Regions:
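Active-site-lining helix/loop region of Rossmann-like oxidoreductase modules
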Residues: 3-134
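C-terminal active-site/capping subdomain that shapes the small-molecule cofactor and substrate pocket
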Residues: 98-203
Length: 203
């Protein structure tokens, strides 16, 4: 999830200076490994057959047709380990030890690819048009952003593909010098160690 988020933020950070991040991630069950995939499949099958004897070994609640705001262990302060990992890893990769970050990580009944809703505030003013230009030459990310024609990233668009997709780019209505955006990527492909190294090399 961190890598997918960073892919959406780094092109903008390099030009406008990242100041703070508010994010909500919608994480596929493949983030829990094969066991998560099987649990979702088993629950969907059971419910389609009218059975209520759902297996719940991986997640504390039914994941089929549900969302669970609980990814990894809860820590002191009410944040999960995954949420704190996003904060700490994001600061480390971007080399911004004082970056203000808050996030909520949610497990969703999608097999593959994580999605992240991000509000990012910058040191310098930035327009939607300037953001699009910043993404143009950045490797590994592609803009899909024409909401009027129902064009925006979805998990299915990125499954088993290397590129992350960004869309719903708009100026935030609350924070100054801020953009809201939607980033989606196959965490298995983009979240691999190789891609983490590639991102570090681009900073």
């Amino acid at each position: 999830t961190t890598i997918v988020t960073i892919m959406g933020l780094n092109p903008l950070h390099r030009k406008f200076g990242l100041k703070s991040v508010i994010a909500s991630s919608y994480q596929a069950v493949s983030g829990s490994g094969q066991a998560g995939i099987m649990e979702l499949s088993d629950q969907i099958r059971a419910l389609s057959e009218g059975r209520n004897d759902l297996t719940k070994n991986v997640y504390p609640h039914q994941i089929a047709f549900n969302v669970i705001p609980h990814v990894d262990q809860f820590m002191d302060g009410g944040y999960t380990r995954e949420e704190l990992k996003m904060l700490n890893e994001g600061r480390k990769i971007l080399e911004l030890p004082d970056l203000q970050v808050t996030c909520t990580c949610v497990r969703v009944p999608v097999y593959r690819s994580h999605s992240v809703s991000v509000t990012a505030q910058f040191e310098s003013p930035v327009s939607v048009e300037e953001a699009r230009v910043a993404y143009e030459d950045y490797p590994g990310i592609r803009v899909v952003d024409d909401p009027g024609n129902a064009l925006y990233p979805t998990p299915l668009d990125t499954t088993e593909k290397d590129d992350c997709l960004v869309g719903r780019i708009r100026e935030d209505m609350v924070l100054e010098n801020a953009l809201a955006l939607w980033v989606v990527g196959d965490q298995i492909r983009k979240g691999a160690a190789l891609n983490a190294v590639q991102i570090a090399e681009l900073l």
